[in-house]
Every structure is written in C-alpha cells, then in structure tokens.
Curated annotation (Swiss-Prot):
GO cellular component: cytoplasm
Entry-linked CDD domains: NDPk_I (cd04413)
SMART domains, alphabetized: NDK (SM00562)
Biological processes annotated in GO: CTP biosynthetic process; GTP biosynthetic process; UTP biosynthetic process
Binding residues annotated for ATP, in chain numbering: K11, F59, R87, T93, R104, N114
Family matches, as Gene3D superfamilies: Nucleoside diphosphate kinase-like domain
Active site: H117
Protein name: Nucleoside diphosphate kinase
Amino acid sequence: MALERTLSIIKPDAVERNLVGKILSRFEENGFQIVAMKMLRLNQAQAEGFYAEHQGKPFFDGLVEYMTSAPVVVSVLEKDNAVKDYRTLIGATDPQQAAEGTIRKDFAESRRRNSVHGSDSEESAVREIAYFFVESEICPR
C-alpha cells in the first residue's frame, strides 16, 4: 500500500446546508488524515480553471455558476490508497446510483448538487491539490 493524497471539495450545496462537520467526520472515521483545508468562495476564473477539462461541454456553464454560488471547503486528505478509497466513500456522481452509506447517497440533492468533489486519479489529485495549495500549506501528520 502506498500513502497517497487526494483533493476533496465540499461543494456549495453541502456548505449551505451546514453539512461540513458531518462530511469531515466521515473522512476521519474512514481513516483519512486532513492535512490541509481552507474555505473559500471561488470566482468565475478559478472555477473555469479548475474545471477546464470540461470546457465546451453542455454542463460547463451551469457547473461554473453552481461552484461560484456559495463557499466551498477544499481539503487535502491523506491515507493509503486515498484516491480509490475516497471515490468509494463519496459514491457515484448521481446520488440515485450511489451505494447506501456513501456521502452522496446520504447528502446529495442531485447530479450537479452532489455535495462533494474528489480527484478521479493520482495524476488528477496532484494537479488539483497544486491548484489550491502550495506545499508549505500541507501539514502531514
């Protein structure tokens, strides 16, 4: 097993509904160490930059509008096999398809308002973490 990092974003719908504490508890209960965290409100340029790979897709503008609608909580999580384990913990993008007990099944409102984002690969995790954090902001434990 290899110690990995992954990026988590608690999205606007979950922040607005005061679910941040419940979601962070799920991370820790499942063995993740929170090694960096910040709350911020993304501006349009930040959201477009983060989701640049989706530019030109029909859902892009709505995604950017949603991600800039309220604050988000961005964190770096660390554990063995973090990327895979986090994806399992959050569940399928569509909460109706998500397994019982996953964050999206328990908290998400819809496919877009699905409460959390998680890196989909180790390569994405490295890129996404660097988008929001400099190495000196990450505090391994």
